[in-house]
């Protein structure tokens, strides 16, 4: 199962906000060094969860040294999935899942940032609102508030 998310950029703070679609919860803005950051729950976040990275809204496994789970990050508009992503990405994610050396966390972070921001910059959309799907992962958001279940079990 996968969760549907609203992904909205707040240009005044350069904060990426993720909220569940159609849920009563409004979620919280997630930000890096440019804005406030909610304290993560210790039970959900391993020691190497990648808190130093600027991108928020991916599950904790995305930047773990053990590698991410099988990720499928999909833009409902441009279908930027691991299927039609740069050829090496599915292999990279698979290798990291197995704990093998692969792309650096910076490379993976850059790929997901491109998925989110490229269309906004090129199309100049004023609403800057997208719907993304992330499936096949048992982890929660790095900064997810405890009552909000953004992602479901695989």
Swiss-Prot record:
Main location: host cell
PTM section of the record: A fraction may be phosphorylated in insect cells and HepG2 cells, a human hepatoblastoma cell line. Phosphorylated in vitro by host protein kinase C or mitogen-activated protein kinase. N-acetylated in insect cells.
Keywords from the named record: Activation of host NF-kappa-B by virus, Activator, Apoptosis, Host cytoplasm, Host G2/M cell cycle arrest by virus, Host mitochondrion, Host nucleus, Host-virus interaction, Modulation of host cell cycle by virus, Transcription, Transcription regulation
Coiled-coil segments on the chain, per record: none
Magnesium among keywords: no
Region listing for Mitochondrial targeting sequence, in residue ranges: 68-117
Pfam family, one: X
Gene Ontology terms describing biological process: DNA-templated transcription; symbiont-mediated activation of host NF-kappaB cascade; symbiont-mediated arrest of host cell cycle during G2/M transition; viral genome replication
Localisation: Host cytoplasm; Host nucleus; Host mitochondrion
A cellular component term, taken from the record's GO annotations: host cell mitochondrion
Role played: Multifunctional protein that plays a role in silencing host antiviral defenses and promoting viral transcription. Does not seem to be essential for HBV infection. May be directly involved in development of cirrhosis and liver cancer (hepatocellular carcinoma). Most of cytosolic activities involve modulation of cytosolic calcium. The effect on apoptosis is controversial depending on the cell types in which the studies have been conducted. May induce apoptosis by localizing in mitochondria and causing loss of mitochondrial membrane potential.
Similarity annotation: Belongs to the orthohepadnavirus protein X family.
Subunit structure: May form homodimer. May interact with host CEBPA, CFLAR, CREB1, DDB1, E4F1, HBXIP, HSPD1/HSP60, NFKBIA, POLR2E and SMAD4. Interacts with host SMC5-SMC6 complex and induces its degradation. Interacts with host TRPC4AP; leading to prevent ubiquitination of TRPC4AP. Interacts with host PLSCR1; this interaction promotes ubiquitination and degradation of HBx and impairs HBx-mediated cell proliferation.
Name by which UniProt lists this protein: Protein X
Organism: Gibbon hepatitis B virus subtype ayw3q (isolate Hope)
Gene responsible for this protein: X
């Amino acid at each position: 199962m996968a969760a549907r998310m609203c992904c909205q950029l707040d240009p005044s703070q350069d904060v990426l906000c993720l909220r569940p679609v159609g849920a009563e919860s409004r979620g919280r803005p997630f930000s890096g060094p440019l804005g406030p950051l909610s304290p993560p729950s210790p039970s959900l976040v391993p020691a190497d969860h990648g808190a130093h990275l600027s991108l928020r809204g991916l599950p904790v496994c995305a930047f773990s040294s053990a590698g991410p789970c099988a990720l499928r990050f999909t833009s409902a508009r441009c279908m930027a999935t691991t299927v039609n992503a740069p050829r090496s990405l599915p292999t990279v994610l698979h290798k990291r899942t197995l704990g093998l050396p692969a792309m650096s966390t910076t490379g993976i972070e850059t790929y997901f940032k491109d998925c989110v921001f490229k269309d906004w910059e090129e199309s100049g959309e004023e609403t800057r609102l997208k719907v993304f799907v992330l499936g096949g992962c048992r982890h929660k958001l790095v900064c997810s508030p405890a009552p909000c279940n953004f992602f479901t079990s695989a």
